[in-house]
Amino acid sequence: MDSPEKLEKNNLVGTNKSRLGVCGWILFFLSFLLMLVTFPISVWMCLKIIKEYERAVVFRLGRIQADKAKGPGLILVLPCIDVFVKVDLRTVTCNIPPQEILTRDSVTTQVDGVVYYRIYSAVSAVANVNDVHQATFLLAQTTLRNVLGTQTLSQILSGREEIAHSIQTLLDDATELWGIRVARVEIKDVRIPVQLQRSMAAEAEATREARAKVLAAEGEMNASKSLKSASMVLAESPVALQLRYLQTLTTVATEKNSTIVFPLPMNILEGIGGISYGNNKKVTAKA
């Protein structure tokens, strides 16, 4: 932001405090006399209506009258010596066309945006710049390119609000001398090459697949831990094994299947288990 001394030096408003002088007063009285002589016709030429959202900057013999804008309402403009300029104080929408930008990581992209601003000082907007709207438009383009050129592509895609706020601050500071207040800056669209879009899509797909595989592996590991815990509980409690057997029979009986399953009774299973256990002991003894 410029220092107060620099702003005062570049500010053309109020730098000339000299009065009209003798010739100026003579012309003033002649103009006033002309208005009185042509009175009722001069009313239509000298009285101007300024709307609520407008202000009028009146130049009398080339100097801004009273160093401030007039309006709203009726204002008096003297013939031949007064010239006035209307200034609209409503918010202006400035669309920034797509700008070719080379990011910090050497990626070419096109970015467009929109700037909302309004004139808060009509005198500064008229006296300090030739065309305030054109100047603001060109400054918004260059500021957008300069700010985005210092960012990487990922920063532009993920940090639009921060970048827009930075652009707004720079524009607001630069246009203060012109009587402009920047209300908001928005980045509308970021266009990247098609080849880069495909690369980013492939990278995102690979990341999703890797994440899905990790989740599946974690699920299998948790399931195996649960099965191990359940098998240990059933091994320690024969009653629990019998209850599980009965639950399985109930489930099979309630399902409408074309295949009929005849489960073996528990005593037969226990007998088979006992025979197998005895054979294992004999083999161990012979060994």
Swiss-Prot record:
Record's bilayer topology term: Single-pass type III membrane protein
UniProt keywords, alphabetically: Cell membrane, Membrane, Phosphoprotein, Signal-anchor, Transmembrane, Transmembrane helix
Protein task: Required for the function of many mechanoreceptors. Modulate mechanotransduction channels and acid-sensing ion channels (ASIC) proteins. Potentiates PIEZO1 and PIEZO2 function by increasing their sensitivity to mechanical stimulations.
Organism name: Mus musculus
Tissue expression pattern: Expressed by all dorsal root ganglion neurons and is selectively expressed in neuronal tissues. Detected in olfactory epithelium.
Subunit structure: Homodimer. Interacts with PIEZO1 and PIEZO2.
Family (UniProt): Belongs to the band 7/mec-2 family.
Protein location: Cell membrane
Single GO BP term: signal transduction
Transmembrane segments: 25-45
SMART domains (alphabetical): PHB
Statement: the UniProt record of this protein carries the keyword Transmembrane helix: yes
Result after altering residue 190 to P: Reduced oligomerization. Does not sensitize mechanically gated currents
Pfam families per UniProt: Band_7
GO cellular component terms, A-Z: cilium; membrane raft; neuron projection; plasma membrane
Modified residues (Phosphoserine): 3, 237
Intervals, Cytoplasmic compartment: 46-287
Deleted gene: phenotype: In deficient mice 35% of skin mechanoreceptors do not respond to mechanical stimuli. In addition, mechanosensitive ion channels find in many sensory neurons do not function. Tactile-driven behaviors are also impaired in mutant mice, including touch-evoked pain caused by neuropathic injury.
Protein name: Stomatin-like protein 3
Domain of life: Eukaryota
